C-alpha cells in the first residue's frame, strides 16, 4: 500500500489516479499512523515552501516522514514535495526543510529568454540509473516551478536544461524526488511511478 500524504497543499487525487492506472494500491491520508504503516509514501505539493513546511510540522508529519525514512521505506516527493525533502529554502524567507537530501531550494535565475516560472514540457537527461530513471534519457516531462533544488551533484539523477541545468530528479538512498509532475507527464510519468512501485515492492520483500 502506498500512502499519498494529504496536508492540504498537494494534488493528491491526480497522483492517486495515476497509481490506480498502473495497478498500485494507494490511499490518501493525513493520519500519521496510516502513513507510518505504508509500504511507501508519496509527498505531493503545490504552493509556497514556508506554508507547506508549516502545515507538515503542525500535523506532526515532519517527524513521521523522518521516522519512515529511517526505516528504509521509499519516499517520493513531487514538485514542492521534492523541495521539502531538502535542508532549507529561501522562498520568501529562510525555512528549514526535512533534511532528507542534502541541498537548498533557490529561485530560478530570471533571464529574458527563460521565463519564471519554468512551465511546460522539457527533456530529461539521466545522470544516474535508478529504477525510476531507467530508459528515460531524452524523454519529456511536465514542469511547473519557480524554485529549484541546489544540491550536490551526487544526489542528482536527472536534469533538464533551462536558464540553468535544473535538477529534475534527486535521490538519496530510499528517498527520491521529482521536480516535475509524473502524474501529468503521460506515459513517461507512469513509467517513473512504475519504478517507484518496483522500489516499494523490493523494499517490502527485503524487510519481510
From Swiss-Prot:
PROSITE patterns linked: GATASE_TYPE_1
Pathway named in the protein's UniProt entry: Amino-acid biosynthesis; L-histidine biosynthesis; L-histidine from 5-phospho-alpha-D-ribose 1-diphosphate: step 5/9
InterPro entries in alphabetical order: Class_I_gatase-like, GATASE, Imidazole-glycPsynth_HisH
Transmembrane segments: none
Any GO CC annotation of this UniProt entry: cytoplasm
Keyword terms: Amino-acid biosynthesis, Cytoplasm, Glutamine amidotransferase, Histidine biosynthesis, Hydrolase, Lyase
Matches recorded under Pfam families: GATase (PF00117)
Domain Glutamine amidotransferase type-1, first and last residues per copy: 1-206
Compartments where found: Cytoplasm
UniProt main location, coarse: cytoplasm
Top-rank taxon, per record: Bacteria
Active site residues per record: 79 (nucleophile), 181, 183
Biological process terms in GO annotation: L-histidine biosynthetic process
GO molecular function (one): glutaminase activity
Signal peptide: none
CDD domains membership: GATase1_IGP_Synthase (cd01748)
EC number: 4.3.2.10, 3.5.1.2
Catalytic activity: 5-[(5-phospho-1-deoxy-D-ribulos-1-ylimino)methylamino]-1-(5-phospho-beta-D-ribosyl)imidazole-4-carboxamide + L-glutamine = D-erythro-1-(imidazol-4-yl)glycerol 3-phosphate + 5-amino-1-(5-phospho-beta-D-ribosyl)imidazole-4-carboxamide + L-glutamate + H(+); L-glutamine + H2O = L-glutamate + NH4(+)
HAMAP family the UniProt entry points to: HisH
Function: IGPS catalyzes the conversion of PRFAR and glutamine to IGP, AICAR and glutamate. The HisH subunit catalyzes the hydrolysis of glutamine to glutamate and ammonia as part of the synthesis of IGP and AICAR. The resulting ammonia molecule is channeled to the active site of HisF.
Subunit structure comment from the entry: Heterodimer of HisH and HisF.
Name of the protein in question: Imidazole glycerol phosphate synthase subunit HisH
Organism, as annotated: Listeria monocytogenes serotype 4a (strain HCC23)
Gene giving rise to this polypeptide: hisH
Amino acid at each position: 500500500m502506498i500512502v499519498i500524504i494529504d496536508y492540504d497543499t498537494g494534488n493528491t487525487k491526480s497522483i492517486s489516479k495515476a497509481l490506480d492506472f498502473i495497478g498500485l494500491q494507494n490511499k490518501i491520508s493525513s493520519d500519521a499512523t496510516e502513513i507510518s504503516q505504508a509500504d511507501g509514501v508519496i509527498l505531493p505539493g503545490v504552493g509556497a515552501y514556508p506554508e507547506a513546511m508549516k502545515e507538515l510540522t503542525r500535523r506532526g508529519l515532519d517527524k513521521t516522514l523522518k521516522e519512515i525514512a529511517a526505516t528504509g521505506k521509499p519516499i517520493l516527493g513531487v514538485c514542492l514535495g521534492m523541495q521539502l525533502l531538502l535542508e532549507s529554502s529561501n522562498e520568501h524567507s529562510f525555512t528549514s526543510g526535512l533534511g532528507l537530501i542534502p541541498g537548498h531550494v533557490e529561485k530560478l535565475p530570471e533571464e529574458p529568454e527563460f521565463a519564471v516560472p519554468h512551465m511546460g514540457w522539457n527533456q530529461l537527461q539521466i545522470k544516474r540509473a535508478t529504477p525510476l530513471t531507467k530508459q528515460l534519457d531524452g524523454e519529456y516531462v511536465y514542469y511547473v516551478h519557480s524554485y529549484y533544488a541546489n544540491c550536490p551533484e551526487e544526489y542528482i539523477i536527472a536534469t533538464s536544461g533551462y536558464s540553468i541545468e535544473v535538477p529534475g530528479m534527486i535521490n538519496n538512498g530510499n528517498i527520491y524526488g521529482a521536480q516535475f509532475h509524473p502524474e501529468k507527464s503521460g506515459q513517461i510519468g507512469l513509467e517513473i511511478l512504475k519504478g517507484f512501485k518496483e522500489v516499494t515492492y523490493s523494499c517490502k520483500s527485503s524487510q519481510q
